Every structure is written in C-alpha cells, then in structure tokens.
Amino acid sequence: MMRTLFKSKIHRATVTQADLHYVGSVTVDAALMEAADLLPGELVHIVDIDNGARLETYVIEGERGSGVIGINGAAAHLVHPGDLVILISYAQVDDAEARAFVPRVVHVDADNRIVALGSDASAPVPGSRTERSPQAVVAGG
C-alpha cells in the first residue's frame, strides 16, 4: 500500500510578487527550495493564511537569497503581494517508509529568511504569536 504524506512546508512565507500574465507556477528562492527539499517542477499546495484560498501548482526556482515567493498566472487572482502563505509538498511512500518518515518544516521571517528548521508540523513559528493546537500530540511526548 502507498500512502501520501506531508513531506515538507515553508511556513508563513510572505508573497513578494504576483504576475497574472505569467504562464503559471510559484517562483521560490532556491535556498528555501533546498531547505524544504523541493525540486523545480514539483507539485505544491499553497494555502493563503490571509484569505483562506487554497491552490496547487508547481515550483520554479528563484534567485538564491532573494526571498522571492512569486505567485504566477491565474493564481494571482487569489494570492497577492504581502499575503502570508504556506507552501506544502507531499510524498507517496510505502507503508514501511511512512512509519519512519520525517518531514521538513521551514520557518521564515517577514523577509522569507530561514529562522528555524524542524520536522514537527504543528510546532509554533519561533518569535511569532502562533500556537500549537491544544489537541495536537507532540511527537515523542
């Protein structure tokens, strides 16, 4: 049996640009892609924290160190510069691998610089007002 699991996320990134007339995708700083184990062309889901929009698209590599999170194409109707978003990727793994799988969580600041790396999908963002859900079980706890 194959299972689809949360593989990685870039949490609370700030959208830096939106280009309605581009052919599609999301442009992501190469350093963020590396930290989140994302490849060019990889499927990601984007969740807009500000307005609740959810969409899926693919990743295009952006300039390393630029902090770019650029929404391209029709998605620019839903997600705008300044919006906070979560970029989420998934992996299909067999049952045995799923039981030992460790995801990657990339926390960024307002300029999309990495402030923390982890593997706990429910961990609060360091230095923010975010909180862990009171119903979440802490791994290993």
UniProtKB/Swiss-Prot annotation:
- GO BP annotations listed: alanine biosynthetic process; pantothenate biosynthetic process
Q: Which reaction does it catalyse?
A: L-aspartate + H(+) = beta-alanine + CO2
Q: In which pathway does it act?
A: Cofactor biosynthesis; (R)-pantothenate biosynthesis; beta-alanine from L-aspartate: step 1/1
Write the record's keywords in alphabetical order, separated by commas: Autocatalytic cleavage, Cytoplasm, Decarboxylase, Lyase, Pantothenate biosynthesis, Pyruvate, Schiff base, Zymogen
Cofactor binding notes: Binds 1 pyruvoyl group covalently per subunit.
**MF terms per GO, please?**
aspartate 1-decarboxylase activity
Leading EC class: lyase
Which of this chain's residues are annotated to bind substrate? 57, 73-75
Query: What post-translational events are described?
Result: Is synthesized initially as an inactive proenzyme, which is activated by self-cleavage at a specific serine bond to produce a beta-subunit with a hydroxyl group at its C-terminus and an alpha-subunit with a pyruvoyl group at its N-terminus.
Q: Where is this region: Disordered?
A: 121-141
* HAMAP family the record matches: PanD
Subunit text: Heterooctamer of four alpha and four beta subunits.
> What is this protein's name?
Aspartate 1-decarboxylase
User: Which gene holds the coding sequence for this protein?
Assistant: panD
